Amino acid sequence: MYHVVAATTNPAKIKAITLAFTDVFGAENCRIEGVDVDSGVPRQPLGSIETRTGARNRVMMARQVRPEADFWVGVEAGIEESMTFAWMVIENTHLRGESRSASLVLPESILHGIREGRELGDEMERLTGVQNIKHKGGAIGVFTDGKLSRTSVYHQALLLALVPFHNPIYQIPVQAAKP
């Protein structure tokens, strides 16, 4: 059984991680454990590089907390220009898989608050009245009227980040081209 450490305690992220690992390896073969670790980036990462760094840092911290695990998973949401998205980073002892989620253009009413230094989740709570929205459907759930959620969008990106761990083509050694 694979011991998978999710570098988060956010229920929406843990559910996405659970769904992805279950899809790839089977529910009976995975045990998911969430741990609270720091991303090492601001609460609201800005830009792809800062956001991916946050996901990688989460994996690094989770590895320190649970070194005996088989997989470590970091998910970090961020904003780039006018869009929200997230980076997924999955590692085992010898491989790393990464993927970026789909992006959602945010309305100016939200972006204004972010430019003033507030977090997307806080702005969404302020505008919708939904407490702790980032642990639920998130901005994606609100703007798609529930057709998508943080969990569903992250699930898809996590499946892509898992590809190097199960697709045999990724294990084929590189052969030098013959002149």
Curated annotation (Swiss-Prot):
The record's remark on the cofactor is: Binds 1 divalent metal cation per subunit; can use either Mg(2+) or Mn(2+).
- The UniProt annotation places substrate binding at T8, T9, N10, P11, A12, K13, E68, A69
Write the record's keywords in alphabetical order, separated by commas.
Hydrolase, Magnesium, Manganese, Metal-binding, Nucleotide metabolism, Nucleotide-binding
* Requisite cofactors: Mg(2+); Mn(2+)
Q: Where are the transmembrane segments?
A: none
> Which class of enzymes does this protein belong to?
hydrolase
> At which positions is Mg(2+) bound?
D38, E68
The keyword Protease is assigned to this record: no
What this protein catalyses is: XTP + H2O = XDP + phosphate + H(+); ITP + H2O = IDP + phosphate + H(+)
Q: Which family does it belong to?
A: Belongs to the YjjX NTPase family.
Q: Which NCBIfam families match?
A: inosine/xanthosine triphosphatase, PRK05074.1
Oligomeric and partner information = Homodimer.
Instruction: Please give the function described in this protein's UniProt entry.
Output: Phosphatase that hydrolyzes non-canonical purine nucleotides such as XTP and ITP to their respective diphosphate derivatives. Probably excludes non-canonical purines from DNA/RNA precursor pool, thus preventing their incorporation into DNA/RNA and avoiding chromosomal lesions.
Query: What protein name applies here?
Result: Inosine/xanthosine triphosphatase
Q: What is the lineage of its organism?
A: Bacteria, Pseudomonadati, Pseudomonadota, Gammaproteobacteria, Enterobacterales
